[in-house]
Amino acid sequence: MKRIPSLIIGLLLILATWHSVLAINDNYDLIIVRNDDLIDYLISLPYSHLINAPILPVNPKELDPVTKAQLYSYIQLGRDKVLIIGNTNAVSLDVEKELRDMGFSVTRIGGADRAETAEKLALHFYQNGSKVVILASAWDYGSTLAAAEFAMEYKCPILLTWENQLSPSALRGIEKLNAKIVILVGFGINETIEKTLEGMGYETYWIGRDIEPPPIETTTSSPPQSSGSKSFFLGMIVTLIILAPVILYLWRRRSERMSEFLEQFNEKELAVLKAIMERGGEVKQEDLPRIVGYSRPTISRIVQDLEKKGIVEREKSGKTFIVRVIKKIKID
């Protein structure tokens, strides 16, 4: 646990060094998101903070009278540029038409799914690129909330990925932003994603996992700190205080989810899984009876059950099968 504060402080120093250049062709007075799913709201937070525009969650199908009254008051004050986040499944064309009929100039940024929407937002608001990007799970809202807080504080774009593999949208975003450093946040991401990024040459750090602190270049002498530097380090301390309960919550949630996940397996299934993982994650099915001591019919039934649960896959190899773990789990 002692490594976590050092890691975060190191990351903040790196973020300060790799400061991103922001370029926005259009400014917006208001950001519209759907009110029945938090994900679009969360990924819009960093950009709302960048342009000082409020976020208004609305009914995705139609504007209710109360919302219309708010919007009428807003446009009368000269705030008429609206950004809708999400495709027409997220916020309908009817809502967009209502906004235009009220006199708003409407821009929509949305993709085929939440990961692509996050990619398009990042590229729209960081048209000059960003050396650092924040990466979170598209389905772990707690991690995305923490990632959004980091992105707000240090002006970095946020991207979303799938749990077990790097989403194509996240990869495109990282490449088009010309990123050098990818910061993964939370427990909703499989370690294979980090390995994929490292294999492609990106420098990665993981907030919410106990890893070694990154190397930080130091000098023997440094100029006197300005008031801006003091404010920056004060901001780091505040960030640590804010994130501490979030990280603790994510850790507890991960432990609970892992416990619930393991409950779906019986003793024999766990024994077979452990045997496969101890041998590098794959083994010949014909060798399993000897390794775990179960009969061939029992092994065949267990492997088929694990395959149905999406934990292993089988590949034909001669007269037997190669059984391969495709979703890594920790078995004590």
Curated annotation (Swiss-Prot):
Membrane topology: Single-pass membrane protein
Keyword line: Membrane, Signal, Transmembrane, Transmembrane helix
Chain segments annotated as transmembrane: 231-251
Pfam family for this entry, one: DUF7343
Keyword Iron set for record: no
Top-level division of the source organism's lineage: Archaea
Entry annotated with the keyword Ribonucleoprotein: no
One GO CC annotation: membrane
Cellular localisation: Membrane
Cleaved signal peptide residues: 1-23
InterPro entries: ArsR-like_HTH, Bact_Sporulation_Assoc, Cell_wall-bd_2, DUF7343, WH-like_DNA-bd_sf, WH_DNA-bd_sf
Location, primary (coarse class): membrane
Name listed for the protein in its UniProt record: Uncharacterized protein PH0614
